[in-house]
């Protein structure tokens, strides 16, 4: 069997037997281009530019993505506190990705597309059980799926506070390095932690029309109920802007997810 494979490779690809044997022993890596791969490749890119140790395994890095990101980051680093990076600590799976001089911290976020959304650390996509525990409802709701309408009612009644918690956990570091459109042509957005908190105090906030109440729409084609989602807005009339999106997942991972729209974080 092995001989037939070697012969097929040499005949098809016009390579030597030695090259064919090497290809069998070490097939080329195939990258999934997932959000995780992009994020780890971006972290590797920052480490490469700053000449610091990277703890990410080589087989988890997409070299093409890393080099593409290095290309847009290199002319940027001399103008920002990025040049003060001392070490990469993202491998700890905490809120901080890089430690800077003077005790400052940096978080790295990547988006596959330019119109992506950013999920807060720690509280952005908890399971139903974790959500209930965090917001003090576990004794009442017990992490059960059928109580999603109660969870959404709580969010609506405490929306300003809820969004402030989400915002605090998005800017849990002194700086946020945001790299959108990594799937094609990445760009660089360097955001500083807001000087004034809480941000959401008395703004007019609203949900997408027709999505103000929790409901699961029946999908006739799929013969099942759809997951509920709704967008939250700030302002009125022409000043109305998207803030973020809530999603209630009920599949293999049952969770309450919230993500900020990129344009809100970069402009608010």
Spell out what each predicted region is.
Residues 1-104, 109-268:
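Nucleic-acid endonuclease domains
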């Amino acid at each position: 069997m092995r001989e037939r494979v070697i012969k097929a490779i040499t005949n098809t690809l016009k390579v030597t037997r030695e090259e064919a044997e090497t290809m069998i022993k070490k097939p080329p890596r195939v990258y999934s281009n997932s959000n995780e791969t992009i994020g780890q490749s971006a972290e590797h890119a920052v480490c490469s530019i700053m000449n610091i140790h990277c703890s990410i395994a080589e087989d988890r890095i997409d070299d093409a993505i890393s080099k593409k990101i290095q290309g847009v980051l290199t002319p940027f680093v001399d103008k920002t506190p990025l040049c003060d990076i001392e070490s990469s600590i993202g491998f700890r799976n905490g809120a901080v990705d890089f430690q800077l001089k003077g005790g400052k911290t940096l978080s790295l976020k990547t988006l596959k597309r330019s119109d992506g959304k950013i999920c807060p650390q720690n509280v952005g996509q908890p399971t139903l059980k974790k959500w209930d525990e965090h917001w003090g409802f576990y004794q009442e709701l017990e992490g059960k799926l059928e109580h999603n309408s109660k969870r959404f009612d709580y969010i609506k009644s405490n929306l300003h506070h809820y969004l402030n918690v989400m915002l605090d956990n998005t800017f849990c570091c002194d700086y946020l390095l945001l790299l959108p459109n990594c799937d094609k042509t990445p760009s660089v957005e360097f955001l500083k932690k807001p000087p004034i908190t809480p941000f959401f105090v008395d703004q007019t906030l609203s949900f997408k029309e027709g999505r103000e109440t929790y409901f699961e729409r029946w999908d006739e084609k799929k013969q099942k109920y759809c997951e509920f989602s709704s967008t939250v807005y700030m302002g009125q009339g022409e000043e109305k802007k998207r803030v973020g999106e809530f999603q209630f997942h009920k599949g293999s991972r049952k969770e309450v997810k919230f993500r900020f729209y990129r344009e809100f974080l970069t402009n608010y």
